[in-house]
Regions:
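Hydrophobic alpha-helical transmembrane segments
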Residues: 1-61, 98-213
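Hydrophobic, well-structured mid-protein blocks that either form specific transmembrane helices
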Residues: 59-111
Length: 213
C-alpha cells in the first residue's frame, strides 16, 4: 500500500536530496546513517517503556524516512549501483531486527504475549524479502503483496507510539499479531507468483510427453 506512494514521496524529497548532494554526501552514507539511527532509537528508547516508546517512535521515524531519501539521491546523482541496492536491502533487515527485537526485549518479562507477537513479526517478516529475492534470482517478478515492509513498519510504529501515549497495550499486541499474519500471507502471495510462473513443473510425465509430441 505505502509502497505505491514512493513516486510521490520521491518528488517531495527531491529538494533536500539535491541539497545533500551539493554538500558532497553520498547516498550510501545516508543509508548507513539512517540504519544506525533506527538501531540506536529502538535499542535506547523502547526498553525504557512508557512514554519512551512514543519518543522512540518519533526518533526512529526521522531516520526511517532516509530509506526514501537515499534512493532519491541515487537517482538524481546517477549513482545507483549494485552496492547501493545491496546495502539498502541488507540494512533494511538490520533496522527491522532492531525495531522488533527491541520490542521483544521490552515486553519479554511482564507481557510475554506482546513479546511473542513482536518475535513473530520479526521471524515471519524476514521471509518476505527473501521470497522476493529468491524469486528474482530465478528471473520471476514477485513484488507486492498484501503487506510490504513499509506497510508493516508504519503500522507497527504507529501502534507502538500510541501505546507510548497511554493507550492500552492490547492495541500493540493485536497489531503485531495481525502484521505477522499479513506477512505470512504476503509470503504466500509471492510464492504463488513463482508457482504461476512455473506451472510446467507441475505437469505429469504423461502431459509433458504428449506436449513434446
Amino acid at each position: 500500500m505505502f509502497g505505491k506512494l514512493r513516486p510521490i514521496v520521491g518528488r517531495l524529497w527531491a529538494a533536500p536530496a539535491r541539497g545533500l548532494l551539493a554538500l558532497g554526501v553520498h547516498p550510501n552514507a545516508v543509508t548507513i546513517v539512517g540504519t544506525l539511527g533506527v538501531v540506536f532509537g529502538a535499542c535506547f528508547f523502547f526498553p525504557q517503556g512508557g512514554t519512551m516508546l512514543f519518543w522512540g517512535v518519533m526518533f526512529i521515524t526521522v531516520f526511517v524516512v532516509t530509506d526514501m531519501l537515499d534512493g532519491t539521491m541515487a537517482r538524481l546523482s546517477g549513482k545507483s549501483s549494485r552496492l547501493g541496492a545491496y546495502l539498502d536491502s541488507t540494512l533494511d533487515r538490520v533496522a527491522d531486527a532492531a525495531i522488533f527485537g527491541a520490542l521483544v526485549w521490552t515486553f519479554r518479562v511482564e507481557e510475554p504475549a506482546t513479546a511473542m507477537a513482536a518475535l513473530l513479526c520479526l521471524a515471519i517478516g524476514s521471509f518476505v524479502p527473501y521470497a522476493r529475492a529468491r524469486a528474482e534470482g530465478l528471473g520471476i517478478d514477485a513484488k507486492g503483496g498484501i503487506a510490504e515492509r513499509s506497510d508493516r513498519l508504519f503500522l507497527g510504529l504507529l501502534a507502538t507510539g500510541l501505546v507510548g501515549l497511554g493507550l492500552p497495550l492490547w492495541i500493540l499486541t493485536g497489531t503485531l499479531y495481525i502484521l505477522a499474519v499479513l506477512a505470512a500471507i504476503t509470503v504466500g502471495q509471492r510464492t504463488m507468483a513463482v508457482v504461476r510462473a512455473n506451472r510446467e513443473d507441475f505437469a505429469t510425465p504423461a502431459e509433458s510427453t504428449s506436449g513434446d509430441a
